[in-house]
Each structure stands twice: as C-alpha cells, then as structure tokens.
C-alpha cells in the first residue's frame, strides 16, 4: 500500500469515527422519555409500569383482542405518549408505560373495564355499551352517488326497544355517545329507529368511521382480563441505572484500550481505534433499528466489547507467530489475518447461536440482552476483520514498520496440561460437589435448592431505599413487622441489597390495594421516598413458563452448538468434549448461585448462555489450533503424538486465552463495581463464569478430547 493511499484510508476512518462519535453523543445526550432522537429505554432504565394480562375467556377472537388492545392504548395514551400495548401469544396483552409517577393509580385504572354510554341531550344515560351487539365501519354511496363513510350499529333486543323509544321522542336532536367520560360522537336523530339497526353518518374517512366503530364495540366487550405479571420501577432508580452503567462502560473501555496498547503496541493502537468505532456503531444501530435498551442489554453491549477484543487478540497472536518464523511484518500481517479467520468465525457463530436461542425462547429483558449481544457479535466481526485490518495496514504504510512495534512470539516449552488432567478433573469435581451439597442442604432447610426469584417462583417483590445502612437485625425488627401487618403473611423474606441502603421484601402475591398499602406504610413509618420504590408481581403461571423456557434455552443452544462443531471439525469427539465442558461451566455457575445465594431470576438464563457462548468461543480457538497441528502430523497418531499436539496447542494459545479473559473480565468488573444492584447480581456470576470458562477451555475441554480420542471411536489412537 502506498503512503498516500494509506493516509487517505486512515483519514477516512478517523473522519468516519468522528462523525459516528458526534452522532452517538447526540443520541446518548437525547436518550430519555419523549426525546425524538433517542434510544428507547426499557422500564428498568426509564422507570414506569409494565403489566401483563391473561384473557379469562377461552379462545378469544382476533377482533376482540384487537378491540381490547385499542381500548387499553387509548387509556394509556393519557399517561404517556411513549406508552405501548401489544399482544403476546394468543391470549395475553402487555402494557408498558415509561416515565410515570403514580404507578399504582395507573394499575388500578387499567383494571377497570371502561364504559360506553348513549346519553340524552340533558346528559342522562339511556343505554350502555352492553346493549350494542356489533358496530362496523363501512363505505356506501348516497342517492347522488357520492361516497360516504358510516358506522353501522346492531343492537340487542333490549337495546333496540330502548333505542326505538328514545329516537322517536328526540327527532332532530343530538344524542351524545360517551366513552370513559369523553364524547366520541354527537349524532343527530334523523328519524325513529325501531328495527334494532342504525347508521351514524358524517365521517370524513373510512379510518375515522372504523375507529369510532371500534370504540363503540369496546364498550360492549365482555372480555375479562386477569393480571399475570406487573412491574413498577421508580424513575429515580432508572436514572441511576443508566448513568452508572454508561460510566462503567466508558471506564472499562478506556482500561481495555490502555491494556491493548501496552500489550500489543501498534496493533493495540489499531485495535483501540477499532473498539471506539465498534462502540459508536452499536449505539447508532440501537437507534436506527429502534431497539429498546435494558439493563441486561447494556451488559450485552459491554460483553460485546470483550468479544471484539478477543477477535483482535487472536489476529495479533497469529501475526507475532509469523514474525517469529522469520517472515516480514507485512507478510505476517496478511497471513495472520488469514489464519485467524476460521477460529474467529467459528467462535463467534457459536456465540451467535446462544443469542438467537435467547431471542427465540427468552422474553422481556432477556430478549433485550440477546438483541444487543447479537448486534455486538456482528459488529465485532466487522471491526476486527475489516476496520482493524485497514488501520493496521495504513499505519505500516505510513512508516511504522519496525518489527519491535509488532512483537515476536517467544518459543515456549510445551506445558504438560494433559499430564495434569486428573488434578483438573478432581478440582472441578470438588467445586461441583460443593454446589450440589449446598443445594441439598438448602433444599432440606428452606424448601428450595436455589434462591429462586419471583421469575421462577411467583409472588410480589418490593425494593425500597431506606436512606441508611441497616443490619439484618434492624430489618427484622423495624421493617418486617410492618410488612407482616399489611400482608398478613408470616413468611416474609427481607434481604439487604449489598453495597446500597436498599432492602428487598418478598411476599406472597399481593393485590393492587395491598401493594399500595405497603408502599404507603413504608413511606409513613420508615421515611422511604416513594419514588425509590420498585415492585414486581409474577403469577405462578408466568414463573412456571420461565423455568421451562430457561431449561429449553440451555438444551436447545447446546444441541445446535454440538451440531455446528461436529459439522465444522468433522469429528464428534471435538463436539462432545466441548459440550461436556459447557455442562461443567453451567454446573459451576449454578454452584456460585447456590453458595452465594444470588437470586435466580430472569437474567439467570442470560448469564448462563453468555458464559456458554464465551466458553465455547475460547474452546474453539484451542480446537482450531489442534486441528491445524493434527494436519501437520501425517500418518496414524499414537497416544503420545496426541498428547504432544494437545499440549503444544494449549501452550500456543495460552497467552491469547489469558489476555482475552483479562479484557472481558475488566468490562464485567466495571459493571460490578459501578452498576446498580440488579446489574451486580448479573455481573458476579458472570465474573465467576468467565474465570470458569477460561479454566474449562484450557484444563477440561482439551483433556476430555484427548481421553475420547485415545479410547473411543473408529480412529482412536494407538497406545
């Protein structure tokens, strides 16, 4: 590449980054409720109300569901223009209203069935909506052939009788139609209507006629809704969540960039600029595709940064190895990118499988995490394989050609990992056994092996900020009695949220009135600011489905990963050992949840699948090197040959495994240190999982492959 061309390419990349950075800064500064150029925020970031209803009627019609959604949307629009109402499955409706203050009042209002009234000129009611059998918008022509838009009404027998009497006595007068206190039509009686069918004319478009017909039908609906799940997040807590998460991301990114530059010099500079571009691209993509950002979504973005670093580390390690063989820097860069491609693609595709499974089987915040993780994987591939490549080539062409600026892989004596496999297997067995014993003890003493959250058990959880540090004794003496008095529940669980002045209270499922009374009691007797109170209720139906979905997500993702690895490596032993290592990782993560008693909630499955994706990515990089080294060894391999190849491959990829683990760990540590309580509950097992994933890739997966290769299959090695 000529110096002039390199200068132009670098200038274009820097200009593109400057534009993206400016664009991203506008988006971030505008992000909030009601802003035009902003990323939609989930309720956990903006504060607000979310409630999911189950239709009581069996097999509701599509029209009834549509009418009910329309009715609820009309109601919630008065609270927030950002509110949304949408259908879930065949018989559920979810309402989300961000940025509201009096959440309980809204929940109570949404629970009312609404009313449709036909009024006399003096305002007295002569007929209600339940006397309307049907209402449909239609298009007809008048006697002159002009198109007109009407609403055709069909009344019940009782309604037809009343309507006939009233219209006979009020010819030439207007009879208002009122829905929920608002006049939606003001038709004039042209003549007595006694046949049970009527027409309302005067609409300017079919849409206007159809909307009026829908509103009239709504008033006559008998659909009953029962609350399945609700969540209330104070706006203050939402604001704290987004600011702390963004701060964690910025600091973590800066630390990772410094680490990359110190470790890799010129390639580290290229990677840092590519990482900055990656981050701005993620922000722009979220905005352009109108993807709702949640707390786990932010975690997905930050984890994606770690994945982007991993791709760069693989490339740079390959470049150093080629330089060590005596090749020029320019040739080494070309070969390094080529050799790194298969490992990067395979690793990211398997992680992508985990995110797709989450999108398909997850819901709510878990699905938001899956979207951001998938975006992160795709963009990390682009920035690592395209952006980093062009930056690196340009820096080289501009004069940074010294081998010292790129590094040279040192020849290391192979470490005998295979010889220590019994030790590694024993360590893992002890850790997993500790988790199983802990689960057994807790199951016997508490009735549940893990600290299941509402998502898996059902009930009501209320979190409030008491403004002071409280001991367990303080909570038991000063808070629990008030809760027991309001709820009549002697089995109240109150726990302190570590690192904060918040307390989480878990009870049986409370009614709306009980929730309001509990919040009022805490505010009056414990000096709690109502804006800091967050509550969530989940029925046993929803919690049962979440447990089922969690299990399905893990099983389905492992099956697809198994098939993909089998297809790519053409050897079931690679796939089987990788999946067994993943099972090991999942069991270790469950052990962490069991020992530390972290709440097992909706983000548990996101955490598990993230670790699965990360671990399989690490394992595939090592397996890719084993595959490469196997190809160099002609003839039938003996057990000693396989041992040598496995140890050599592990040693060659060891620095890459350590460095990529460090960079990803940095991002998650920042989340844990600076994030709010729910993010910390997500980050702690994630940190343990990252350590475990790196350990299993180095000390479990390859050792399992060696055992299978030596002892099982048609092409097993000779001893």
Regions found by a protein language model. Name each.
Residues 1-719:
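A structural signal for conserved, well-ordered secondary-structure elements
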């Amino acid at each position: 590449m000529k110096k002039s061309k390199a200068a132009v390419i670098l200038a274009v990349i820097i200009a593109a980054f400057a534009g993206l950075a400016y664009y991203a800064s506008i988006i971030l500064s505008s992000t909030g409720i009601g802003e035009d150029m902003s990323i939609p925020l989930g309720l956990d970031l903006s504060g607000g109300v979310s409630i999911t209803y189950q239709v009581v009627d069996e097999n509701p019609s599509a029209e009834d569901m549509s009418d009910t959604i329309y009715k609820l949307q009309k109601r919630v629009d008065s609270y927030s223009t950002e509110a949304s109402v949408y259908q879930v499955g065949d018989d559920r409706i979810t309402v989300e209203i961000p940025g509201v203050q009096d959440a309980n009042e809204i929940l109570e209002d949404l629970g009312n069935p609404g009313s449709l009234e036909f009024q006399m000129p003096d305002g007295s009611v002569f007929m209600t909506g339940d006397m309307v059998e049907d209402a449909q918008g239609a298009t007809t022509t008048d006697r002159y052939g002009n198109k007109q838009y009407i609403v055709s009404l069909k009344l019940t027998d009782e309604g037809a009788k009343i309507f006939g009497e009233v219209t006979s006595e009020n010819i030439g007068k207007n009879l208002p139609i009122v829905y929920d206190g608002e006049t939606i039509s003001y038709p004039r009686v042209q003549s007595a209507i006694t046949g049970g069918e009527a027409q309302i004319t005067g609409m300017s478009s079919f849409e206007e006629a159809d909307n009026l017909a829908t509103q009239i039908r709504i008033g006559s609906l008998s659909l009953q809704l029962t609350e399945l799940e609700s969540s209330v997040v104070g706006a203050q807590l939402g604001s704290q969540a987004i600011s702390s998460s963004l701060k964690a991301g910025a600091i973590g990114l800066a630390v990772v960039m410094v680490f990359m530059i110190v470790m890799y010099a010129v390639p580290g500079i290229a990677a840092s600029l590519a990482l900055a571009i990656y981050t701005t691209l993620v922000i722009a993509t979220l905005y352009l595709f109108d993807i709702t950002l949640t707390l786990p979504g932010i975690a997905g973005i930050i984890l994606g940064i770690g994945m982007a670093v991993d791709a760069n580390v693989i490339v740079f390690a390959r470049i150093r190895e080629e330089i060590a063989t005596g090749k020029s820097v320019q040739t080494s860069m070309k070969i390094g990118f080529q050799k790194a491609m298969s490992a990067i693609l395979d690793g990211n595709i398997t992680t992508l499988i985990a995110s797709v499974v989450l999108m398909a089987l997850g819901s709510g915040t878990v699905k938001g995490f899956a979207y951001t993780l998938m975006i992160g994987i795709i963009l990390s591939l682009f920035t690592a394989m395209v952006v980093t490549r062009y930056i690196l080539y340009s820096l080289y062409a501009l004069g940074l050609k010294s081998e010292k600026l790129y590094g040279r892989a040192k020849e290391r004596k192979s470490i005998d990992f295979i010889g220590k496999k019994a030790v590694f297997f024993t360590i893992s067995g002890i850790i997993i056994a500790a988790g199983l014993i802990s689960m057994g003890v807790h199951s016997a003493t508490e009735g549940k092996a893990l600290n299941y959250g509402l998502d898996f058990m059902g009930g009501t959880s209320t979190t409030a900020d008491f403004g002071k540090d409280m001991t367990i004794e303080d909570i038991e003496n000063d808070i629990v009695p008030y809760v027991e008095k309001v709820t009549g529940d002697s089995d109240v669980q109150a726990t302190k949220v570590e690192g904060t002045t918040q307390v989480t209270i878990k009870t049986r499922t409370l009614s709306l009135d009980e929730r309001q009374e509990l919040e009022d009691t805490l505010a009056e007797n414990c000096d709690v600011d109502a804006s800091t109170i967050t509550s969530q209720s989940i029925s046993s139906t929803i919690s049962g489905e979440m447990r089922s979905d969690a299990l399905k997500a893990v099983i389905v993702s492992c099956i697809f990963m198994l098939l993909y690895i089998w297809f790519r490596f053409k050897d079931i032993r690679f796939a089987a050992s990788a999946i067994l290592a993943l099972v090991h990782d999942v069991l270790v993560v469950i052990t962490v949840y069991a020992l530390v008693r972290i709440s097992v909630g909706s983000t548990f499955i996101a955490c598990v699948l993230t670790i699965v994706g990360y671990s399989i990515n690490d394992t595939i990089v090592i397996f890719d090197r084993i595959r490469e080294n196997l190809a160099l060894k002609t003839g039938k391999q003996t057990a000693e040959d396989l041992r040598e190849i496995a140890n050599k491959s592990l040693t060659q990829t060891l620095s890459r495994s350590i460095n990529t683990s460090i960079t990803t760990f940095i991002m998650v540590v920042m989340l844990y240190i600076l994030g709010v309580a729910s993010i910390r509950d997500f980050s702690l097992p994630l940190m343990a999982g990252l350590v475990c994933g790196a350990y299993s890739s180095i000390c479990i997966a390859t050792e399992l492959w060696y055992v299978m290769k030596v002892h099982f299959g048609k092409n097993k090695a000779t001893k």
